[in-house]
């Protein structure tokens, strides 16, 4: 996809294959769920009802909306907010931070990158049951949010670098509040 379309994705999360034990658990869980579903359909058919195709939700729509409100209400101090924007600025004007960065980045993140960092950092803090965003939240989610928004230079690619390495370097160079 062109950069402008890639930028519309909130995150690019890299997921490894599960370990053998984890994959065994997945197989066993899915097998049990399938058995439960078949059993439920059989019971419904025996009483003359059409088998259910819609399962009961694990959480209600109200709970989802409440969680979204709580995420949006996460506090981000002006210093952390500035740090967040500086991380994105470092992808656009890398020479301000280090000459090597400017040799590695052809194209940096747009304002959507800052918006995505804001949303994801707040969600990350909420998942950790905090009511504020810390620089560590931004550092944790920065690779997933920025990796598809940075176009590496030929120099970086010829050295075998990837976006995650460049982001790690940005996180080292941008001063943390």
Label for each model-derived stretch:
Residues 33, 90-93:
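Active-site/binding-pocket entry motifs
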